[in-house]
């Protein structure tokens, strides 16, 4: 199924794509899903009942990572550790903008992604409580010190549902720190 994109705009460096249900009624409220990396086609089966919001950051290696870390290999860019600033933009201003444009059900907001996008979503649980569901598909939990951080820090969003999905062979074919991906 091909999604129809009803609105596209840039909010503080984040490319935003919005797909409304085809029967969108401005007098009704709708659950919404915010998806890092913006590939809404993964969620197309939900498109008739949910507002889908694709988010594409300017630099995913910076915006989806919690702290600075060296590159995985020589010649590759380092990880910038700007997830807090990204989430400040997302939950501080962009979410308000979306709520002014569309009828979002504040009690049914989901946020997630895959790989680094999933890492960022899980990391948001420790500082923000704006969403009721967080999901991570093959989240980059190999990220240095992330598992330790999760064990030692307090979660702020205690009422949030959390869905994690990882493959059983995460990191198997890597010779760098990706090989340390938790299963």
Describe the function of each predicted region.
Residues 1-30:
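A domain-start/cap signature at the N-terminus of enzymes
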Residues 35-38, 55-58, 114, 137-139, ...:
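Active-site-proximal beta-strand/loop segments in catalytic clefts of secreted hydrolases
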Residues 86, 115-118:
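Active-site loop->helix "elbow" adjoining a glycine-rich segment at hydrolase catalytic centers
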Residues 103-114, 134:
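Alpha/beta-hydrolase fold nucleophile elbow
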Residues 118-128:
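Short glycine-enriched nucleophile-adjacent loop
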Residues 130-141:
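A conserved short beta-strand
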Residues 141-183:
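The feature captures the conserved acid-bearing segment of alpha/beta-hydrolase catalytic domains
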């Amino acid at each position: 199924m091909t999604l129809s994109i009803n609105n596209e705009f840039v909010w503080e460096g984040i490319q935003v794509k919005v797909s409304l249900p085809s029967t969108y009624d401005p007098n009704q409220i709708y659950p919404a899903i915010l998806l890092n990396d913006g590939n809404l086609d993964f969620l197309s089966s939900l498109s008739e009942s949910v507002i889908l919001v694709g988010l594409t950051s300017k630099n995913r290696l910076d915006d989806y990572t919690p702290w600075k870390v060296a590159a995985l290999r020589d010649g590759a860019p380092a990880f910038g550790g700007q997830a807090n600033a990204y989430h400040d933009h997302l939950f501080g201003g962009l979410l308000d903008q979306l709520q002014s444009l569309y009828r979002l059900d504040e009690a049914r907001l989901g946020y997630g992604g895959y790989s680094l996008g999933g890492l960022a979503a899980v990391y948001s649980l420790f500082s923000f409580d704006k969403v009721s569901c967080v999901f991570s598909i093959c989240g980059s939990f190999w990220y240095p010190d992330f598992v330790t951080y999760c064990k030692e820090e307090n979660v702020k969003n205690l009422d949030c549902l959390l869905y994690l999905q990882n493959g059983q062979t995460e990191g198997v074919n890597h010779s760098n720190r990706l090989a340390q991906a938790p299963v």
